[in-house]
Amino acid sequence: MVIPRGENVLLWDVKVKNTTDAVRNLSLFTYMEFSFHHIMIDNQNFQMSLYCAGSSYEDGIIEEDLFYEEKGYQYLTANFTPDGYDCVREKFLGVYGTEDHPAGLERGTLEGSTELGGNHCGSLQKNFKLQPGEEARFVIMLGEGNREEGRRIRVKYSDLKRVDAVYTDLAAYWKQKYAALQIQTPNEGMNTLINTWTLYQSEINVMFEGR
């Protein structure tokens, strides 16, 4: 997983390789639950949460509309055309179902559910075939914004060279940060703690301190 600098999106970069000598017919499923941006709704007021959001699907993009925020939208999309989707948690997990045995995976197909109100999730399905030794790469994109923003991000990061460039950019960014001060001790673990981990934690705290 990686977050490109300057973008409000999380990229799940997934590679699947067939290491056997047989052709494999596979299905990839995503699953996540959207946040309400409010801990009282997310973790406590479960009755109110049933009326706080709606979900829809169009052109390979799941959009969640947060009714209590004028511009509150979230999306899930990918660099492939989905073969199925579900936006309602109970449809994917099943009635009284859990993530251990989701009904959608047991069926092998998703139901195409959307709803105004209720509990929402983001599940996309992609069926694909891999020849022996063949590898497939999928990029799933979870971000802040409406469907139009999702389309922009989908076009941008469906180009795998741009995904690779995100890693290069982040590596260069942190290399510059770390280069400001390097301390060497006889203990390699202490070096990592001082030169990498402590600096990283300090940077993250500064980023989130005013939010």
Residue spans of the language-model regions?
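Substrate-binding groove/exosite segments of carbohydrate-active enzymes
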Residues: 113-121, 134, 175-211
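Polysaccharide-binding surfaces and accessory modules of carbohydrate-active proteins
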Residues: 1-107, 122-124, 149-180, 187
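Short loop/turn segments at secondary-structure transitions that flank enzyme active sites
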Residues: 20, 32-34, 136, 144-148, ...
